[in-house]
Regions:
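Class I S-adenosyl-L-methionine-dependent methyltransferase catalytic core
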Residues: 1-137
Length: 137
């Protein structure tokens, strides 16, 4: 869960059976709320929490040799340089064979990832766009 905020997506994944969630959030106010939410839900054993910037997730040693089912990106709407993150996901070989990247963006954001990922599905909700991506083989 990159750009985790208060952790709603990752915590929902835990409630639905995820074995482990890696949270990356560097905004201190959101991080504090996320820590409280984790404690309140008593799911500390299923969580790894990092205060690193999401753009540095690839330096996290706990992710080395991991294979993930799902990677969620919910950056601030003004953030435009997600290609670096997507490239690092590929370099680290983080996704399982049928793993997905879920991207939550402003509906008008133009993304540039077609050479790495294919769009499985994309839907707009109000001012948001949620896109499901799969690695091109």
């Amino acid at each position: 869960d990159l750009f985790s905020g208060t952790g709603s997506f990752g915590l929902e994944c835990i409630s639905r059976g995820a074995a482990k969630v890696y949270f990356f959030e560097n905004y201190i106010q959101s991080l504090e709320i996320l820590q409280k939410n984790i404690k309140k839900l008593k799911c500390e054993k299923k969580v790894r929490l990092s205060s690193d910037d999401a753009f540095n997730f690839h330096k996290n040693k706990e992710l080395k040799n991991k294979k993930l089912d799902l990677i969620f990106l919910d950056p601030p709407y003004k953030e435009e340089n997600l290609e670096i993150i997507l490239e690092n996901i590929v370099k680290l070989n983080l996704l399982k064979e049928n793993g997905l990247v879920v991207l939550h963006r402003h509906k008008k954001t133009k993304d540039n990832f077609e050479n790495i990922f294919s769009t499985v599905r994309s839907s707009k909700y109000g001012i948001s766009k949620i896109t499901f991506l799969k690695l091109i083989k």
